[in-house]
């Protein structure tokens, strides 16, 4: 694995900002709902890995970031109503001035943070000087491993969320 220094370019900065935003939302969510703390602890490690590897300009960091963050945003558009509900309560707060359901509103910055990770990962990979024939296989492996790690974390820490994985295979727009 060849690395090129520690200087962050704009794509790596997007990965860093998006990941840190999402990790903060994971922490905040765990504050509101203590029984998901362990799940969010393990989930955050995928983002720490993406940050560290991306800061070292490793394609694995970009692939992990794309896989983990892409899956989270996909789930929240096609499987759950969490993001939609967050938007609803955010707009209600803006229009009425009454803050309600912060536990739902945090889905919006979480989704945006993950989108930044996806955008930064795609951009960083696109500017790599050499693309390898095996990179598509590496992306598939990163997706399988991050999804498997997430599924194992859910199975151990919060079994009630396991049906999300069925929804990944049979997506719909729950709006």
For each feature predicted by the language model, list its residue ranges.
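Alpha-helical transmembrane segments
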Residues: 8-25, 143-150
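Hydrophobic cores of alpha-helical transmembrane segments in multi-pass inner/ER membrane proteins
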Residues: 45-54, 106-123
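Hydrophobic, membrane-inserted alpha-helices
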Residues: 20-26, 43-51
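C-terminal TM-helix exit segments that contain a strictly Trp-centered aromatic cap at the helix terminus
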Residues: 71-86, 149-162
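Interfacial segments of alpha-helical transmembrane regions
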Residues: 12-17, 56-70, 137-144
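Membrane-interface helix-boundary motifs at transmembrane edges
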Residues: 2-8, 52-63, 126-138
